[in-house]
Regions:
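Glycine-rich phosphate-binding loop and adjoining beta1-alpha1-beta2 segment
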Residues: 54, 59-97
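Conserved N-terminal Rossmann-fold NAD(P)-binding element of oxidoreductases
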Residues: 35-37, 60
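Conserved SAM/SAH-binding loop
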Residues: 106-114
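Conserved S-adenosyl-L-methionine
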Residues: 50-56, 147-148
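N-terminal charged helix/coil linker that caps or initiates catalytic domains
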Residues: 1-34
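Glycine-rich phosphate/adenylate-binding loop
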Residues: 2-6, 120-124, 129-135, 151, ...
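Hydrophobic/small residue at the entry helix of a nucleotide-binding pocket
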Residues: 41
């Protein structure tokens, strides 16, 4: 019987190589990617990258899988509830490609922990965190790194339902996204600005209002947010795959 493991790399990427060529596939395989936040957006981004041939990914998140994650987060299933998110996702990614180098960090990104991640060692840094304060700090630090390190940020994916309104643009050109607006306001208030331009994935759709009762999630042990917004898998997954696409296209362009 054919050894599935030893033939994995050649077999699973034959369609990628057929489309992009051997040289581009090798570039993809050698890229180093750091993903902050592996929830509804980041988990799908990681999967898209691994399936496209990226071998070296570090995933960062401090949370455990909660039952309410099961509607949108890749690794969240009835079996993984209670597990550390990055561990569950790492296992999933290694099932896709056992030869991948997936580093799982159960840590929270904050100004106090930023130096622990050695961002200068990566080719791509993906921001998929939703804390305004921490996101702002990450943006400032990532855009201060050398220009060969590409930074991509996800804006708000909650409270939307139309995947055909998802776009990409430079941060200062994002229109209609409350998260981007709050970030820009924060930068202006503090008089600290990103050192360079960077691409964001966002939605032009006007955010909806939660139609359900907030008490549905008031006892959600896996979240410390004062306000929890509804979200849908086809939106968060589209955000994540769009970011994966930006990374892949940047590698081969």
């Amino acid at each position: 019987m054919e050894n599935k493991i030893t033939t994995m790399e050649g077999g699973m990427q034959c369609r990628t190589e057929l489309l992009l060529g051997k040289d581009n596939l090798e570039k993809i395989q050698s890229a180093r990617v750091l993903i902050f936040g592996v929830g509804g957006v980041g988990s799908w981004c990681a999967e898209g990258l691994v399936r496209s041939g990226v071998r070296n990914i570090t995933i960062v998140d401090s949370d455990r899988v909660c039952v309410t994650n099961c509607n949108r987060q890749l690794m969240a299933t009835s079996r993984t509830i209670g597990e550390v998110k990055v561990d569950a996702l790492r296992q999933r990614l290694l099932e896709i490609n056992p030869d991948a180098n997936i580093i799982a960090c159960q840590k929270i990104y904050q100004a106090e922990t930023a130096e622990e991640f050695h961002m200068e060692e990566y080719d791509f840094i993906i921001d998929a965190i939703d804390s305004l304060k921490d996101k702002a700090d990450l943006i400032l630090r990532a855009t201060a790194l050398p220009k060969h390190i590409t930074f991509v940020s996800s804006m708000g994916a909650a409270l939307r339902r139309d995947p055909f309104m998802i776009r990409k643009t430079e941060f200062w050109k994002v229109d209609g996204d409350p998260l981007a607006r709050c970030l820009r306001k924060r930068f202006k208030k503090n008089k600290t600005f990103p050192r360079r331009k960077f691409i964001c994935v966002y939605s032009e759709e006007k955010p909806m209002q939660n139609m359900g009762d907030q008490r549905l999630v008031e006892h959600e042990w896996c979240s410390t947010k004062a306000q929890i917004n509804g979200s849908l898998c086809h939106i968060t997954a589209s955000f994540g795959m769009a970011i994966a696409g930006i990374v892949i296209n940047h590698i081969i362009d």
